[in-house]
């Protein structure tokens, strides 16, 4: 079952419900009605208030797979956002299993890309490249051609980060660790940020430095 605002794509085999806050049918009310039907999977289009998140997390603790969205800058800050909404840390620790954050970036046109001579090792170091990486890196940009209508970009691609809430992170949430401490635990256990993926795409020539800055260095 899904609760959406609005229902943008109709999918066969899925019960989709349109949220209508004007008549009092909110995400919270939709969730309550879903639980009476005991579905295996629930999608809540967006978590906007404490009541909705509490029901969603409790649903996750009673054998339902629950998906939803939340407005934050990255995956780790979703935990802080839930805490700031007044959600008890024990509920977050027990119910949350995975967080994914994503941005959409324009892909450099492969038909007209050239090396961007303005990108210096010092500039690459400033965004987290290691000196030995910066020294040999070749960063590309689109020069514009008929295949990309002169824009230098052709197509789009996702830039992602996926944070698995493992036992160490669950313990950190229960211990009321600060977000910086939770970030450190995640990185130690192999978490790669959107910036890390963006740097990989810079090195592969799929992402221009200008697009990296636009998508990943502005909130």
Model-derived features: where do they sit?
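Short, flexible helix-loop junctions that flank or precede catalytic/ligand sites
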Residues: 1-219
